[in-house]
Amino acid sequence: MRIPVEYIWIDGARPTKRLRSKIKIVDVEDRTNVSLGDMPDWGFDGSSTGQAEGNFSDCKLVPVRVYNHQYDHIPLVLCEVFHSDGIVHETNTRHALARMQEELIDEDVWVGLEQEYTFFQGQRPLGWPEGGYPPPQGPFYCGVGADEVFGRGLVLEHMYSCLNYGIQLSGINAEVMPGQWEFQVGSGDPLKMSDDLIVARFLLYMLGEKHGINVSLEPKPVRGDWNGAGCHVNFSTKSMRQDGGLELIHEACARLGDRHKDHIAVYGHGNEARLTGLHETCSINEFRWGISDRGASIRIPMDTAFNRKGYLEDRRPAANCDPYEVCHILMETICK
């Protein structure tokens, strides 16, 4: 049986990589349960994606995870990028995370990813008055009503699409700035959660196309007294989740502080406009951690402090971060 499948990959755009996709027609035995074994390697013009020069432009797509839809929609195939000779491409950050996760398998790392994003219609956030501004922030976070939240129909459509594709979505909410939303993925192993986040972003972009709404992952989409957009990461190891784990979380915070600049370097372009010390952030030039402190670099949730075990939340990553790079450096800093 011949069916269409959508190959998805991350390009080499700078300073922030983008998603690319194209459709391939493949032969499968069971269209309701397409597997990696059904998916051949493919190629693309790397000179058009910032991943090759025009005189040697072929790059290879290697399928690494298939997302089947429970109601027979087109399967989605997440791919890694390789050079035509089979060498891992420099833009392929997933490959390094897969190796790191295998190396640290006994740590049993879990992550949860909180993806914030902003809807735009034309040059202004969705729901904002033309040529003006909405009322000050306050009523919009988890708001209800057509005067407080904008784009809920698309958000719910995205939620169900993610669930139907088997993405480990754990929640959604309207955010502090009007026109801004968040969805959460996880918790689970870093590679699967990062894959799920990339495919969830892809679905959000595709639904935005359908509705004529642009989806922005800019860390500070509107200058001024408005919240930015982040991708907070909830992180734990098996030992942190066990009795006495709080001491290990404190040790992890100290390690993270020692490598603050290294982390900021891979936490998303334009993050300096967001990490100002205002709007529930810590200054990009400062590192501190605290219990239940959303103005800290690292927040230890109240339940974690009370139970003396659990997880930490790294609040520094920007909405446009590469989750593979973020999870890789967190594991490297905390677990090695």
Language-model-detected regions and their locations in the chain:
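Glycine-rich, acidic/polar active-site loops that bind/position phosphate-bearing ligands
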Residues: M1-K336
